[in-house]
């Protein structure tokens, strides 16, 4: 299943196993009637992993090559050169280094990016500088010029992309959310963009989907 209507799974008397076809299980566990005695597993799909790699690489390149500035110059018919920094000049931090996070880290390392990873518990990954827990989070954020969120959505990670996190990033950092909409405090992101703490954001998910037509994120230039 992907996102069954609330109450559906509880109504299935012969239910013995639930397999989530998405990257996480939070969308299923949000159903208060979900039968907690039924095993819940998630599917690891090579196609899903490849799709996430491509999205994260695309978003990272857009941010580090400052394509938002180039698009603005084009729209205004302004010939303006921008400083080009190679991948080796950037520090990319990935929050969440499970299956998807590790795959994306490997792809970015192959392109020359300096990759760091943060998780709740200690992990070791070849070529990745890893941090863990609350104690490691601040140092991780302080060094992340590009912050990529691939965390699962849990009570502990709800709203983790908010003012406190943005204020710990380097001035002018980029934020990429490919996790869940619930990770992002959208009002805090807009404020961080407006004051330049965050230079640019790439969002794959939102708290409300489809994003309402009147939402200010539609019109924000960055």
PLM features: what roles do these ranges have?
Residues 1-71:
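Phosphate/diphosphate ligand-binding glycine-rich loop within oxidoreductases
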Residues 12-16, 35-38, 113, 171-173, ...:
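A short helix->loop->beta-strand "cap" motif at the edges of active sites that frequently abuts
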Residues 37, 88-92, 163, 172:
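Phosphate-coordination loops involved in phosphoryl transfer and adenosine-cofactor binding
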Residues 91, 113-114:
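Residues at the starts of beta-strands that form the adenosine-phosphate
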Residues 122-216:
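Rossmann-like adenosine-cofactor binding region
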């Amino acid at each position: 299943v992907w996102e069954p209507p609330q109450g559906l799974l509880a109504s299935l008397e012969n239910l013995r196993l639930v397999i989530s076809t998405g990257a996480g299980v939070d969308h299923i566990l949000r159903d208060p009637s979900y039968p907690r005695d039924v095993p819940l597993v998630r599917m690891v799909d090579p196609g899903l992993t490849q799709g996430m790699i491509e999205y994260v690489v695309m978003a990272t390149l857009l941010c580090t090559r400052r394509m938002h500035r180039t698009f603005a110059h084009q729209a205004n018919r302004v010939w303006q050169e921008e400083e080009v920094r190679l991948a080796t000049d950037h520090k990319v931090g990935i929050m969440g280094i499970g299956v998807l996070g590790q795959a994306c880290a490997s792809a970015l390392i192959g392109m020359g990016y300096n990759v760091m990873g943060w998780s709740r518990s200690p992990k070791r990954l070849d070529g990745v500088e890893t941090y863990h827990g609350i104690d490691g989070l601040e140092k991780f954020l302080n060094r992340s010029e590009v912050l990529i969120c691939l965390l699962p959505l849990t009570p502990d990670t709800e709203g983790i992309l908010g003012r406190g996190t943005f204020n710990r990033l380097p001035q002018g950092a980029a934020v990429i959310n490919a996790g869940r909409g619930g990770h992002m405090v959208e009002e805090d992101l807009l404020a961080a963009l407006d004051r330049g703490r965050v230079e640019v954001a790439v969002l794959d998910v939102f708290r409300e989907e489809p994003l309402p037509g009147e939402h200010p994120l539609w019109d924000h230039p960055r």
